[in-house]
C-alpha cells in the first residue's frame, strides 16, 4: 500500500515538476531571478519522493518516472543530457530559470540513486558546484538556490562540507549568496550540535536532521523536510515555533507575507501540519530559547524568505523587526482528531444579515416524516463531532514576554551604544519603564485567561455530560410515552435538566464573552486592546529605532570618514615620530662627538702643559748636568775649601775656649785671629776662583 501510494505521489509530483520547469523554461537568468515558494515546494516534493523510494524495493522507479516526464514534448532525461553535455561550456547553455532548476534537481536525484560513498558524492558535488559558480558569475543570479537534499548531506563528513563551503567562499565573483549561507549553516550547526545537549530533530523515511538553532525555510526546503514530518526537541527548549503555511501576501515594501505557526509545547510531534501539496506550504523552525549571539537566523527576513527578491536581505543587512507580531498561531495538527466541520451545508451567519454572533446557524438535513426536523437551528454544542477552532491573532499572549525581553535587550544595547550621557537616555528609561509595566499587566491578564480557560473546560465537560444525559432521557421518553406517571416524571426531569443546561450555557456564554474581551479586544480596556496599543507602541519604537539606525548609519559614515582621517594622521604621526627619533639619534650622536672633541681638546691642553713641563724638566736636567760637570771639575777646590772650613772652625773653637778660660795672652789670641782672617780670605779667594772658572766654562760651552 505504501509503495503504491508513493508511486502515485511520484507520478503526480513528476508531472507538476515538468509543468513548472516548462513554465520557467524561457525566463532568462539575471540578478532579479529567484524561485517562488510554489517552485521550491514542487522541487522539494519530487526530491522527497525519490528519497523515500530509497528505502523500498522500488527505489529506481520514482527516478524513472521523473526521467520519462516530458518538457516541451521531449523526455526529461534527454533534455538533461543536452543541457549538461558532459559539463562542457554548461554556463552558456544553462541560461534560464527552467534549465537551472532541471539541471540541479536531476543532478541531485541521480546522485541520491546511484552514489553511496561519501568520497564519490564529494567528488561529484565539487565539480557540480564549480559549474554552479560559473553560471552565477556569468549571469549574476545571486538569489537562485537549490540546496543539497538531506539524503546526500547525511553521507558527507564535516571535512567534505567544509571543502564544499570553500568552493563558494573562495569564488567571490560567483555571487552565490544562498549557497554560501547554506554551507555556513551546516558548518555552524555541526560545531554547535557537537558541544550542546539542546536539539530539534526532524525526520522522515530514512533521513533525519538535528539543529540547536533556528532553521530558515530555504534550508528546510533544500533538506526536503516538511512540517508534516516527525519533530522532536529536547526538554530544555521551551520557546520553539514551527512555521507551517503562508496565509496571504501583502505586496508592500516592508513585508511580503503573513504566516501561520505552531508553538511546540510537547517534546515530540508526529507532524504539526497535514501532509498536502499546497503551494503555500512553509516549514521553518524559530528557536527563541537559545542565545541570540549564536543564532544568526532568528530575524524574520532571514528565517522566512520573501517572495520578492528586493525584500531579501543578507545577514549583514538585516535590521531588528517585530514582523512576527503579524503572524498567526494555530494549534498543532493531530490526525487522530476529527476535522472541524466546513462546507456541509451550514450557512455563513453573516450571510443573512445582522450581527455575526447573534445569527443562528442553520443546517439543512435530509427531509423525513417529521416536519419539525426539516429545517432547524444548528447548535454546535449538541454536535458530538464539533471541534471549535480558535484563531489567534499574532503571537499568543504568553509569547509577548519574549518580545518584551527582546525589546529590553535591544534597549540595553542601544543604551550602551548611546552612552550614559546620551540625549536619548531619558526616552530609553521611559521605554524600559513602560515595558516593565506592560510585562506586569500581561502577567495578570495571562493568569486570568488561564483561570477562565480552565473554568471554560470544566463547563464544557459539564455541558457535554448534561447533553448526553438529555439525549439518553429523550431516547427513554420516545420508548415509554404511554401517559404513565413515569413519563411525567421523565418530562419533569428533562425540564430540570434543560434549565440546568440553559444555565450552564449562559455561564459558558459569559465565559466566552470574557475570553473574547481578553483575546479579541471587543470592549475598551480589554487585554487585546491593550496589546493592540502595545503593538502600535512597538511599531512606533520600531520606526524610532529605524530612524536611530539611519542616524547611526550617518554617524558611522562620518566616523568612518574620521577614522580614515585619523588613520592618515596616525600615519603622518608615525612618520613624524620616526623623524623625531632620527633627529634625537643625530642630536645624541652630535652631543657625543662634542663631548669627545672637548675631551680631546682638554687632553691637548693638558698635553701642551705636560710638554712645557717636560721641556722645563729637560732644561733643569741639562742645568743639573752642567752643574754636575762643574762640580766634577771643581771637586779638588771643593775639598780644599772644606779643609779650610774645618781648620777655621777648629781655630774658632780654640779661640773660644781660650777666651772663656781666660788663659793665654793677647798675642796668641791676636795670632789666632789673624790666622782665622787669613784662612777666610783664602776661602773667599777659592770661592771667587770657582765662580770665575764656572762662568768661563759656560762661556766656552756657549
UniProtKB/Swiss-Prot annotation:
This is A-type inclusion protein A25 homolog. PANTHER family: STRUCTURAL MAINTENANCE OF CHROMOSOMES PROTEIN 2. Residues 347-360 have a biased composition (Basic and acidic residues). It comes from the Viruses. Structural protein that forms a matrix surrounding the mature virion (MV) through interaction with protein A26. Presence of protein A25 in the virion structurally prevents direct virus-cell fusion mechanism. It comes from Variola virus (isolate Human/India/Ind3/1967) (VARV). One of its GO terms (biological process) is viral process. GO terms for cellular component: virion component. Residues 420-522, 548-692 form a coiled coil. Some orthopoxviruses such as cowpox, ectromelia, and raccoonpox viruses, form large cytoplasmic inclusions within which mature virions are embedded by a process called occlusion. In those viruses, A26 bridges mature virion with inclusion bodies through interactions with proteins A25 and A27 on the mature virion membrane. In variola virus, the protein A25 is deleted in its C-terminal region and no inclusion body is observed. InterPro entries: Pox_A_type_inc. Residues 342-380 are annotated as: Disordered. Belongs to the poxviridae A25 protein family. It is found in: Virion. Keywords: Coiled coil, Virion. Interacts (via N-terminus) with protein A26.
Amino acid at each position: 500500500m505504501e509503495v503504491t501510494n508513493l508511486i502515485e505521489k511520484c507520478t503526480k509530483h513528476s508531472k507538476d515538476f515538468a509543468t513548472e520547469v516548462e513554465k520557467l523554461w524561457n525566463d532568462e537568468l539575471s540578478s532579479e531571478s529567484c524561485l517562488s515558494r510554489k517552485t521550491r515546494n514542487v522541487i522539494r516534493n519530487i526530491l522527497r519522493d525519490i528519497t523515500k523510494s530509497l528505502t523500498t524495493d522500488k527505489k529506481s522507479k520514482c527516478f524513472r518516472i521523473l526521467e520519462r516526464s516530458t518538457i516541451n514534448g521531449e523526455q526529461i532525461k534527454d533534455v538533461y543530457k543536452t543541457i549538461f553535455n558532459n559539463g562542457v561550456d554548461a554556463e552558456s547553455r544553462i541560461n534560464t530559470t527552467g534549465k537551472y532548476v532541471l539541471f540541479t534537481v536531476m543532478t541531485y536525484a541521480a546522485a541520491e540513486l546511484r552514489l553511496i560513498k561519501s568520497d564519490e558524492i564529494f567528488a561529484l558535488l565539487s565539480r557540480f558546484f564549480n559549474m554552479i559558480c560559473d553560471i552565477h558569475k556569468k549571469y549574476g543570479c545571486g538569489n537562485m538556490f537549490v540546496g543539497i537534499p538531506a539524503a546526500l548531506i547525511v553521507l558527507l563528513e564535516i571535512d567534505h562540507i567544509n571543502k564544499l563551503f570553500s568552493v563558494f567562499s573562495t569564488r567571490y565573483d560567483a555571487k552565490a549568496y544562498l549557497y554560501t549561507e547554506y554551507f555556513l549553516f551546516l558548518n555552524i550547526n555541526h560545531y554547535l550540535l557537537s558541544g550542546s545537549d539542546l536539539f530539534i530533530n526532524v525526520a522522515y523515511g530514512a533521513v533525519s536532521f538535528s539543529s540547536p538553532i533556528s532553521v530558515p525555510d530555504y534550508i528546510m526546503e533544500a533538506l526536503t523536510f516538511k512540517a508534516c514530518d516527525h519533530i522532536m526537541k529536547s526538554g530544555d527548549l521551551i520557546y520553539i515555533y514551527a512555521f507551517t503555511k503562508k496565509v496571504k501576501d501583502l505586496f508592500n515594501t516592508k513585508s511580503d507575507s503573513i504566516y501561520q505557526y505552531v508553538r511546540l509545547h510537547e517534546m515530540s510531534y508526529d507532524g504539526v501540519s497535514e501532509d498536502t501539496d499546497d503551494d503555500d506550504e512553509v516549514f521553518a523552525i524559530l528557536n527563541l530559547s537559545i542565545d541570540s549571539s549564536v543564532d544568526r537566523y532568528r530575524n524574520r527576513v532571514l528565517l522566512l524568505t520573501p517572495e520578492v527578491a528586493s525584500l531579501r536581505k543578507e545577514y549583514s543587512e538585516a535590521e531588528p523587526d517585530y514582523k512576527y507580531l503579524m503572524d498567526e498561531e494555530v494549534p498543532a495538527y493531530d490526525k487522530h482528531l476529527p476535522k472541524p466541520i466546513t462546507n456541509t451545508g451550514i450557512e455563513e451567519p453573516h450571510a443573512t444579515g445582522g450581527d455575526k454572533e447573534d445569527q443562528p446557524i442553520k443546517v439543512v438535513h435530509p427531509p423525513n416524516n417529521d416536519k419539525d426536523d426539516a429545517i432547524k437551528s444548528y447548535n454546535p454544542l449538541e454536535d458530538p463531532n464539533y471541534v471549535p477552532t480558535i484563531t489567534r491573532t499574532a503571537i499568543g499572549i504568553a509569547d509577548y514576554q519574549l518580545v518584551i525581553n527582546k525589546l529590553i535587550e535591544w534597549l540595553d544595547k542601544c543604551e550602551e551604544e548611546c552612552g550614559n550621557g546620551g540625549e536619548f537616555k531619558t526616552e530609553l528609561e521611559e521605554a524600559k519603564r513602560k515595558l516593565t509595566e506592560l510585562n506586569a499587566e500581561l502577567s495578570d491578564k495571562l493568569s486570568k485567561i488561564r483561570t477562565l480557560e480552565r473554568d471554560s473546560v470544566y463547563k464544557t465537560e459539564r455541558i457535554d455530560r448534561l447533553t448526553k444525559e438529555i439525549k439518553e432521557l429523550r431516547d427513554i421518553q420516545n420508548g415509554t410515552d404511554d401517559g404513565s406517571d413515569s413519563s411525567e416524571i421523565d418530562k419533569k426531569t428533562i425540564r430540570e435538566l434543560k434549565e440546568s443546561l440553559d444555565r450552564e450555557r449562559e455561564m459558558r456564554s459569559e465565559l466566552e464573552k470574557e475570553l473574547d474581551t481578553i483575546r479579541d479586544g471587543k470592549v475598551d480596556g480589554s487585554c487585546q486592546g491593550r496589546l493592540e496599543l502595545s503593538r502600535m507602541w512597538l511599531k512606533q519604537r520600531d520606526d524610532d529605532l529605524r530612524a536611530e539606525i539611519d542616524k547611526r548609519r550617518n554617524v558611522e559614515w562620518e566616523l568612518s570618514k574620521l577614522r580614515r582621517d585619523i588613520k592618515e594622521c596616525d600615519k603622518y604621526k608615525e612618520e613624524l615620530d620616526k623623524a623625531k627619533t632620527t633627529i634625537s639619534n643625530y642630536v645624541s650622536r652630535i652631543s657625543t662627538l662634542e663631548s669627545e672633541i672637548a675631551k680631546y681638546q682638554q687632553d691637548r691642553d693638558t698635553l701642551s702643559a705636560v710638554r712645557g713641563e717636560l721641556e722645563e724638566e729637560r732644561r733643569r736636567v741639562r742645568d743639573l748636568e752642567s752643574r754636575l760637570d762643574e762640580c766634577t771639575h771643581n771637586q779638588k777646590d771643593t775639598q780644599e775649601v772644606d779643609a779650610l772650613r774645618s781648620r777655621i772652625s777648629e781655630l774658632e773653637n780654640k779661640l773660644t775656649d781660650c777666651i772663656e778660660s781666660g788663659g793665654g795672652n793677647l798675642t796668641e789670641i791676636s795670632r789666632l785671629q789673624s790666622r782665622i782672617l787669613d784662612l777666610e780670605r783664602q776661602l773667599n779667594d777659592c770661592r771667587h776662583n770657582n765662580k770665575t772658572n764656572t762662568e768661563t766654562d759656560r762661556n766656552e760651552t756657549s
